[in-house]
Regions:
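Short acidic, glycine/serine/threonine-rich loops at helix termini
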Residues: 18-23, 43-46, 93, 112-119, ...
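A glycine- and small-aliphatic-rich helix-loop capping segment at beta-alpha/alpha-beta transitions
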Residues: 23-29, 119-124
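Glycine-rich beta-strand-to-loop/alpha-helix junction loops that act as flexible
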Residues: 8-14, 18
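Short, surface-exposed connector motifs at secondary-structure boundaries
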Residues: 4, 23-28, 50-52
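C-terminal catalytic subdomain
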Residues: 97-167
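Short, small-residue-biased leader/transition segments that mark boundaries at the very start
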Residues: 2-6, 169
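Ligand-binding beta-strand-loop-alpha-helix segment within the catalytic cores
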Residues: 37, 41-107
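Short internal beta-strands
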Residues: 30-36, 53-54, 141-143
Length: 169
């Protein structure tokens, strides 16, 4: 298994698809060190694939929030909540060797990534830990559908409308 590999999962449709892929894989004894716990991580815990998830917050649908409240004693053994200053701390992320998968809205040909704003001004996602995890993870990637609005808008653009992370090395 990958028990010693710490995974950081971003928020969004592609990161959720990755969680679903893990659910249907042969991998087990996973550990997640991330900022936000979402529905897919609860499914992994329920399936016995995710041993523990460490995060700062929850972003759950109403059904999953209810499920967690109803089974709090069970989830208490699998979830650790930490202050943001610890969960996003560069030294901790590096030491654990986190593999990061962050969602993005758009990326440009210069290596800049916009993971927070639509059209440069409307906030879609919080600022979050994508910068912390991108800079400090052992392996870091941004994931996104290739297009939006039924193929009308490309996720790869000449210049992003808002720079959240510069991914050049």
């Amino acid at each position: 298994g990958l028990g010693d590999v710490y995974k950081r999962q971003g928020v969004g449709n592609i990161p959720n698809a990755v969680l679903d892929g893990l659910l249907h894989s042969d991998l087990e004894h996973l550990t997640s060190y991330t900022e936000v716990i979402q529905d897919g991580m609860i499914d992994l815990i329920d399936a016995g694939k995710l041993d523990v998830a460490s995060a700062t917050a929850f972003s759950l649908s109403p059904d999953y929030a209810h499920k967690m409240n109803e089974n709090a004693a069970f989830y208490r053994d699998h979830i650790i909540l930490r202050p943001q200053e610890i969960s996003n701390h560069p030294e901790v992320i590096r030491r654990l060797g986190v593999i990061g998968a962050n969602g993005m809205i758009e990326a440009d040909i210069y290596g800049n990534v916009n993971s927070t704003h639509v059209m440069g001004s409307r906030m879609m996602n919080g600022i979050g830990g994508s910068g912390d995890f991108t800079r400090n993870a052992y392996i870091s990637a941004f994931v996104s559908p290739s297009t939006a609005k039924n193929g009308a808008i490309s996720a790869i653009v000449p210049m992003v409308s808002h720079v959240a992370v510069s991914y050049t090395h």
